[in-house]
UniProtKB/Swiss-Prot annotation:
Assembly and interaction partners: Homohexamer. The homohexamer assembles into an open ring structure.
Organism: Gemmatimonas aurantiaca (strain DSM 14586 / JCM 11422 / NBRC 100505 / T-27)
Gene: rho
PROSITE patterns: RHO_RNA_BD
EC primary class: hydrolase
Alphabetical list of Gene3D superfamilies matching this protein: Nucleic acid-binding proteins (2.40.50.140), P-loop containing nucleotide triphosphate hydrolases (3.40.50.300)
Gene Ontology MF term list: ATP binding; ATP hydrolysis activity; ATP-dependent activity, acting on RNA; helicase activity; RNA binding
Keywords, comma-separated and alphabetical: ATP-binding, Helicase, Hydrolase, Nucleotide-binding, RNA-binding, Transcription, Transcription regulation, Transcription termination
Binding annotation for ATP: G487, Y488, G489, Q490, R491, A492, R499, A500, G501, K502, T503, T504, R530
GO BP field: DNA-templated transcription termination
Protein name: Transcription termination factor Rho
Length: 737
């Protein structure tokens, strides 16, 4: 057999050394012809030129590799021999040679001992393959019998050393497919060491090529003898995790993320739907083919295993079966959405947020019964007690929203309820027994107070009691009935300077209403008054006293007044007569000016422009309801302070001056002379008083008033007091004129 390979054989000299891979420098590697591009091409094996057809095991790649090795060793044979201009074909897989063959084969490494140390890994690998090919050719040409097939040779000592050759073979086979006469990387019938490498990937043909590269990489020949072999038979947990990830790439919510994914080193990751990487183009693809075969292999085995991620991937895959719920469990079973263990929505919630089992929702027992006024809140309401002036207290029982809706409760309704305690120890209303001293069912269709039609009073509130009137309250009551009579639904304003006797006047009115008109509901409202006057009024025992003394905050004054007004409105809706005695409306307006949120526009005296809205609404609620509209009345007798030296008090009085239909003015000069009652007869009076007097009394009252106007205020009041003390009642006084 003739050819360049057989003509340039070098006989062995001396003892036969072991086969060593030749080492070349960067300059020698630069002379190597450029490898053709492998992108999108189908590689074919060209016919051998220099080797005869009778040796099928020797092909052009081996011949060319041998000639390259001889040209680099300085033998004089040109590298441009046969087949140098043809495209570089795929190299055959070089089997591990037994020790006997290695001793009989000539070596080409002796001629290259003077070559410098390798500077790059690519040159080392190519030279190694060339030298191996040249050695095989020389040995095959020296022996007339053909060499045995690589598949028939036993691989008995291939454990610690074949990493470079196997790595290069695996790399070429995984990229370009298998050539004729040798099995591919995914050959279903491998044997020995190759079978152990290919078994996990053969079981999963759609596994990503990332693992192919991980098994192919190496760090060069210096690690071939020191690194022990790692088992490939068992499948690692992270491989199963990555397989599950690729199986879920067809989900709609993952497509955008795959499109934006980047590979290692900033290169785009071109994995397809099945996990296989598309064939890359450009210089990045060439660099990826020239990368060290075992680099990824080292990283894959040096990276610590994460056994907990296998459960994580299975949990994510199982989440697709729960109606598309895309919950993502964290590592070690942590759930991002804080559901049950393993992400199950139906798992019971544990911890401090879990509802207590068997906790009672109803009161434990009945504590007793109580009466109070209903004060609504956002959810339900509370029952305010009279001993606290119907103000909030921690012991007030709570009214459930169901009872509020059932009985259509409104603020100010008087209730008698049965209450108990819930599981937290709070007071809770169990049952409503009475509503406004009647059945709760009867009051379901009551009218609204704002829809009631107001009219002038036509029924007189007689204050005269028939008691001796030498001095004291009876004298005051009889004087009021003659000068400024008060009727049901009257809006009376008592204009009183300081120390003019307004408190005594109010006490006389309260006593007369309580004695003469017990059917009327009397409410005494004391706002910002002296505590001793509050105590005296309560001790007196006439009417129901609701008070807030001056040592209380302004907010309490406002709350007390609003609750009292709402209570009076609820009674009027039922057709009852209510009388409110307020002391004083000036202090109430001051409290609203302090508490309410103003607009920033102030009148003289520092009074806000909107501070008088609620006090006016309070005073304007007094009205008499005609019988055809349901009847009932609300009478308000309020005091207004004047001559206090405060400009604000004067402005408040001017605001109320034209709102009342009855006005009683007290004279400070008469009070200084100890003349009581100190009425200013000329400025006191009642509008539409003809509706309150009998026809026979009306003319006599006009005659009396004309006579009193002719006298000075002091003399006229002194004369009237003497006439009242001389008579037993007003009828006898008028008859004596």
């Amino acid at each position: 057999m003739s050819g360049p390979c057989s003509a340039h054989r070098v006989p062995p000299i001396g003892p036969r050394p072991t086969i060593r891979s030749p080492r070349i420098t960067r300059s020698s590697r630069m002379t190597e012809p450029k490898r053709p591009s492998r992108r999108g091409t189908t590689r074919t094996r060209p016919a051998p030129d220099s080797v005869g057809d009778d040796n099928p095991y020797l092909d052009a790649p081996a011949s060319r590799a041998s000639s390259e090795s001889r040209s680099e060793s300085g033998s004089g044979l040109s590298a441009e021999g046969s087949g140098s201009d043809a495209p570089r074909p795929r190299r055959p897989r070089q089997p591990r040679r037994p020790a006997a063959d290695a001793e009989s084969a000539p070596t080409a490494a002796d001629t290259n001992d003077s070559a410098p140390a390798p500077t790059a890994r690519r040159g080392v690998r190519r030279t190694t393959r060339s030298a191996a090919a040249g050695t095989d050719v020389s040995s095959s040409t020296s022996e007339l019998p053909r060499a045995e097939s690589p598949r028939s040779e036993p691989r008995t000592e291939s454990r610690p050393e074949p990493r470079a050759e196997n790595g290069s073979e695996t790399r070429h086979e995984s990229r370009g497919g298998s050539s004729e006469g040798r099995p591919s990387f995914r050959d279903p019938s491998p044997s020995g060491y190759e079978a152990s490498m290919e078994r996990p990937l053969a079981d999963r043909p759609d596994a990503p090529n990332r693992y192919d590269r991980a098994f192919d990489r190496t760090d060069g020949p210096e690690r071939q003898d020191t690194r022990p072999e790692r088992p490939f038979q068992q499948e690692r947990p992270f491989q199963q995790d990555r397989q599950d990830r690729h199986e879920r790439q067809d989900r709609p919510d993952r497509r955008d993320r795959n499109g934006r994914r980047r590979g290692r080193g900033g290169r785009p990751d071109n994995r397809g739907p099945g996990g296989d990487r598309h064939q890359s183009t450009g210089p990045a693809a060439d660099r990826s083919h020239d990368r060290g075969p075992d680099r990824n292999n080292e990283r894959a085995f040096d990276r610590p295993e994460r056994p907990d991620r296998q459960g994580e991937s299975s949990d994510r895959f199982d989440s697709q079966d729960r109606g598309g719920n895309r919950q993502r469990n964290g590592r070690r079973g942590r759930n991002r959405f804080r559901r049950g263990a393993g992400g199950n929505e139906s798992a019971p919630i544990s911890g401090s947020h879990a509802p207590s089992q068997g906790s009672p929702s109803a009161p434990i027992g009945v504590e007793g019964t109580m009466a109070g006024w209903f004060d609504p809140s956002r959810d339900g309401g509370f029952l305010r007690r009279p001993e606290n002036s119907y103000l909030p207290d921690p012991t007030d029982p709570f009214m459930p929203p169901a009872l509020v809706r059932l009985h259509q409760l409104r603020r100010g309704d008087r209730l008698e309820v049965t209450y108990g305690r819930d599981h937290r120890g709070r007071y809770l209303v169990i049952e409503v027994q009475t509503l406004n001293d009647g059945s709760p069912v009867v009051l379901e269709k009551r009218p609204d107070f704002n829809t009631l039609v107001a009219s002038y009073p036509d029924r007189k509130l007689t204050l005269e009691t028939g008691r001796p009137a030498k001095t004291g309250p009876e004298l005051t009551r009889r004087a009021i009935d003659l000068i400024a009579p008060i009727g049901y639904g009257q809006r009376a304003l008592i204009v009183a300077p300081a120390r003019a006797g307004k408190t005594t006047l109010l006490q006389a009115i309260v006593e007369g209403v309580s004695i003469n008109h017990p059917e009327a509901v009397l409410l005494v409202l004391l706002v910002d008054e002296r505590p001793e006057e509050v105590s005296e009024m309560i001790t007196w025992g006439y009417g129901e006293v609701v008070a807030s003394s001056f040592d209380m905050p302004p907010k309490r004054h406002v709350e007390v007044a609003e609750m009292t007004l709402e209570r009076a409105r609820r009674l009027v809706e039922q057709g009852k007569d209510v009388v409110i005695v307020l002391d004083s409306i000036t202090r109430l307006a001051r409290a609203h000016n302090t508490v309410d949120r103003g607009t920033g526009r102030t009148m003289s005296g520092g009074l806000d422009a909107t501070a008088m809205q609620k006090p006016k609404a309070f005073f304007g609620s007094a009205r008499m309801i005609a019988p055809q509209h349901g009847g009932g009345s609300l009478t308000i007798i309020a005091t207004a302070l004047v001559e206090t030296g405060s400009r604000m008090d004067d402005v408040i009085f001017e605001e109320f001056k034209g709102t009342g239909n009855c006005e009683i003015k007290l004279d400070r000069s008469l009070a200084d002379r100890r003349i009581f009652p100190a009425f200013d007869i000329a400025t006191s009076g009642t509008r539409r008083e003809e509706k309150l007097y009998r026809p026979d009394q009306l003319e006599k009252v006009h005659l009396l008033r004309r006579g009193l106007h002719q006298l000075p205020p002091q003399a006229g009041m002194e004369w009237l007091i003497k006439r009242i003390a001389a008579t037993t009642n007003n009828d006898s006084l008028l008859d004596g004129l």
